[in-house]
């Protein structure tokens, strides 16, 4: 397990070298450029480009080194803005993405499709799942740039620590 500062998955040569040296049997691709609504709104090109770079580099390296199984983590934000609730996986690409995170969503959709295509074309055991919402260590808890859940937790913690009204 490597941190971003140890391995930049946006760099194809570094990614290939890591896979060639480590020869992992199983890969969980959870790495992504992520951010809250404001970051997604102002860095659309960065979100689609960096996430596509990560996905292309990792899937290609996993294929070349014959990884036994790869799990790609999608995102609930890739569903259309007006998807029927409760949302079903078949809703992907059935409508327009939420404009505030469209770049990120399109990259995640591409990652899911790449897993499917590697499986169909080469027989690679690349699968994907779409977790509802996650947070934890290393998440961005800043109310201006973080995701909703982590930002709300940070705001509640701040209010409690500073004895602010509920």
In which residue ranges do the predicted regions lie?
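A short beta-strand-loop structural module common to alpha/beta enzyme folds
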Residues: 1-7
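SDR active-site strand-loop-helix element
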Residues: 2, 27-33, 70-76, 129-131
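NAD(P)H-binding glycine-rich loop region in Rossmannoid oxidoreductase-like domains
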Residues: 9-52, 64
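Conserved Rossmann-fold NAD(P)-dependent oxidoreductase catalytic core, especially the SDR/UDP-sugar
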Residues: 56-101, 127
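NAD(P)-dependent short-chain dehydrogenase/reductase
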Residues: 82-91, 116-166
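Active-site helix of classical SDR
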Residues: 103, 107-110
């Amino acid at each position: 397990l490597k941190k971003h500062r140890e391995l930049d998955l946006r760099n194809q040569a570094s990614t290939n070298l890591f896979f060639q040296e480590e020869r992992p049997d199983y890969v969980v691709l959870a790495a992504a450029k992520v951010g809250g609504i404001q970051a997604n709104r102002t860095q659309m090109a960065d979100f689609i480009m960096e996430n596509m770079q990560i996905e292309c580099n990792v899937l290609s390296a996993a294929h070349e080194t014959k990884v036994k199984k790869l799990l790609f983590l999608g995102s609930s934000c890739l569903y259309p803005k007006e998807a029927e609730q409760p949302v079903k996986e078949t809703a992907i690409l059935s409508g327009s993405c939420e404009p505030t995170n469209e770049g990120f969503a399109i990259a995640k959709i591409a990652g899911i499709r790449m897993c499917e295509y590697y499986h169909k074309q080469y027989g690679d055991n690349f699968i994907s799942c779409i977790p509802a919402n996650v947070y934890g260590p290393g998440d961005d808890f800043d109310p201006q740039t973080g995701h909703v859940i982590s930002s709300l937790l940070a705001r509640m913690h701040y209010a409690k620590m500073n004895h602010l009204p509920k």
